[in-house]
């Protein structure tokens, strides 16, 4: 009787945090373990959790900046050390925490000379600045500067559209991703049919939430995704014959790819390929070749991809289709096509 109770208890899934540290105000790290799992379950959970951590958790960013003193994005203003473009990039890096729904307004109103930091941002009580020491600009002359800001809570990423500045309002690339990175690893133990697995999950965040908070939110989001399968099947949904057909678009290489990579390099580093809805086989081939982000992928040509072990022309077409559909970009056929 006692032996049976012990056997049952060892099969109860348990998780715990085995390491937690704060490297800086904008870099938190956590390492978690989940066990015991049956063979294959650790990879299933690990892949799903990583995708949810990187793509399903909402974050808060500054998405627009507006000032009457800014003639255009690449101008310089007398009395300010930084160019307008540099100021916008500094605003992009500001880490915010909020329970905001949608958007809200904030502002910076200062009189020089002064070193403007994140603490000078006047924001609603629902928005908290994680690191008030983050640098924005340096005013070297005695004049007034007011910048209007738009703050938004969302998920994923949004690249600004070129030439969309209106009335002195400039869009800023937004990376609504509080989780900087997430990795999982698997440890197997036992013999034969009794083999079990331990899942290790590592999470890095930008300080707007802790790794444990990120783990909880990602788990809730995954549960919400699966809940519909617990309900009765809808019987009155009729699909047309052509609704399940996918037509691959005609692919052309855009000459602006190199320019796109250079201009959006930071944002592209934070777009991981497992957010691109690639089939698991295609994703695993890319992963084994150290292609982890969209920037890594854009540095390859179609010819490079075909050199990857077990990578087929069908896989290349899938990659091209997703790049064209989601980002309106393409890969060159070879290194000399651009």
From Swiss-Prot:
Compartment(s) where it occurs, according to its Swiss-Prot or TrEMBL record: Plastid, Chloroplast
Superkingdom, taxonomy of origin: Eukaryota
Domain note: The N-terminal domain is essential for RNAP assembly and basal transcription, whereas the C-terminal domain is involved in interaction with transcriptional regulators and with upstream promoter elements.
Which GO molecular-function terms appear in the entry?
Answer: DNA binding; DNA-directed RNA polymerase activity; protein dimerization activity
Query: Which reaction is the catalytic activity of this chain?
Result: RNA(n) + a ribonucleoside 5'-triphosphate = RNA(n+1) + diphosphate
Instruction: Using the UniProt annotation, give all residue ranges assigned to the region (Alpha N-terminal domain (alpha-NTD)).
Output: 1-233
Main site of residence? Answer: plastid
Q: What is its EC number?
A: 2.7.7.6
Q: What protein am I looking at? A: DNA-directed RNA polymerase subunit alpha
* Record bears the keyword Transcription: yes
> Subunit notes for this chain?
In plastids the minimal PEP RNA polymerase catalytic core is composed of four subunits: alpha, beta, beta', and beta''. When a (nuclear-encoded) sigma factor is associated with the core the holoenzyme is formed, which can initiate transcription.
Lineage start: Eukaryota, Viridiplantae, Streptophyta, Embryophyta, Tracheophyta
One GO biological process term is:
DNA-templated transcription
């Amino acid at each position: 009787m006692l032996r049976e109770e012990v056997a049952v208890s060892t099969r109860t899934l348990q998780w715990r945090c085995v390491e937690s540290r704060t490297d800086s105000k904008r870099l938190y790290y956590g390492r978690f373990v989940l066990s015991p799992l049956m063979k294959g379950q650790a990879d299933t959970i690990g892949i799903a959790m990583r995708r949810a951590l990187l793509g399903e958790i909402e974050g808060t960013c500054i998405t627009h900046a507006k000032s009457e003193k800014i003639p255009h994005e690449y101008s310089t203003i007398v009395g300010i050390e930084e160019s307008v473009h540099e100021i916008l990039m500094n605003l992009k890096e500001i880490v915010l925490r909020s329970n905001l729904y949608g958007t809200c307004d904030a502002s910076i109103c200062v009189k020089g000379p002064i070193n403007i930091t994140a603490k000078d941002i006047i924001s609603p009580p629902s928005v908290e600045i994680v690191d008030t020491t983050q640098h924005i600009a340096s005013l070297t002359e005695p004049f007034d500067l007011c910048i209007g800001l738009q703050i938004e809570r969302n998920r994923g990423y949004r690249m600004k559209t070129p030439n969309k500045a209106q009335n002195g309002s400039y869009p800023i690339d937004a990376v609504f991703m509080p989780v900087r990175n997430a990795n999982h690893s698997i440890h197997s133990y036992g013999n034969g049919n009794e083999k079990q697995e331990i899942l290790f999950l590592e999470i890095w965040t930008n300080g707007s939430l802790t790794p444990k908070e990120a783990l909880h939110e990602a788990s809730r989001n995954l549960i919400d995704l699966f809940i519909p399968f617990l309900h009765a099947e809808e019987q009155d949904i009729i699909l047309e014959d052509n609704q399940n057909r996918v037509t691959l678009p005609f692919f052309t290489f855009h000459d602006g790819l190199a320019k796109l990579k250079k201009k959006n390099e930071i944002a592209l580093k934070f777009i991981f390929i497992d957010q691109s809805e690639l089939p698991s086989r295609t994703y695993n081939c890319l992963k084994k070749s150290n292609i982890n982000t969209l920037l890594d992928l854009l540095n390859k040509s179609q010819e490079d991809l075909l050199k990857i072990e077990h990578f087929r022309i069908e896989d290349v077409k899938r990659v091209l289709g997703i790049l064209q559909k989601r980002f309106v970009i393409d890969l060159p056929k070879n290194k000399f096509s651009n």
